[in-house]
């Protein structure tokens, strides 16, 4: 793909769903309000996805349209969406039984409990043949920008870090799994990248 062709990207945003008293609740009635709305690993979490888009304007428009539909429906149902990375409260968060959850429980074990308390935004960028290393290194360089959007320092009601989500993912949930959770170092050559993927 020549560099002049558009780079397709999509976004997934996750929100905690709360009732009018601020208690976490299931997103009943919200999933069907728009295309791209889905349940996640845990009961009170809602994910809204876009399709791959070629322009920022197209991506923004689709995300705003889908999010707007969910927000209007949430308002009708007395629900709210909370964009915090981790909930402030200390209560347990119930799993949403699924094959994905069972796999994570089997692979990650007890440490998957940390993931249950995390919501976030995920950006998917189309891989360009021949440009994989430049793309990876660019994304690694952009990662520190996460520090600018930390939204909750809490895990189970306790202040644990300025950005609890990063700490939970990188240093607790996936700490025992090489190549998962932590930020990968820059890559200098294709062979190094291939070796990492084979591990």
Label each residue range with its predicted role.
Residues 117, 126-199:
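Loop-rich catalytic cores of soluble enzymes, especially ATP-dependent carboxylate-amine ligases
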Residues 1-112, 117:
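Terminal catalytic/cofactor-binding subdomain
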Residues 123:
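An acidic/histidine-cluster motif and surrounding catalytic segment
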């Amino acid at each position: 793909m020549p560099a002049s062709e558009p780079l397709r990207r999509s976004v997934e945003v996750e929100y905690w769903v709360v009732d009018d008293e601020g208690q976490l609740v299931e997103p009943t009635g919200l999933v069907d309000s728009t295309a791209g709305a889905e349940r996640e690993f845990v009961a009170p979490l809602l994910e809204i996805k876009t399709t791959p888009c070629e322009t920022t304007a197209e991506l923004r428009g689709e995300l705003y349209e889908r999010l707007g539909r969910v927000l209007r429906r949430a308002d009708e149902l007395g629900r709210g969406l909370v964009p915090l990375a981790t909930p402030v409260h200390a209560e347990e968060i119930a799993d949403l039984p699924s094959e994905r959850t069972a796999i994570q429980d089997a692979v990650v074990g007890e440490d998957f409990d940390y993931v249950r308390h995390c919501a976030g935004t995920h950006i998917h960028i189309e891989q360009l043949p021949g440009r994989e290393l430049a793309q990876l290194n660019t994304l690694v360089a952009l990662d520190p920008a996460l520090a600018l959007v930390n939204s909750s320092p809490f895990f189970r009601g306790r202040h644990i870090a300025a950005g609890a989500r990063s700490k939970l993912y990188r240093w607790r949930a996936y700490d025992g799994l090489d190549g998962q959770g932590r930020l990968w170092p820059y890559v200098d050559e294709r062979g190094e990248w291939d070796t990492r993927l084979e591990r």
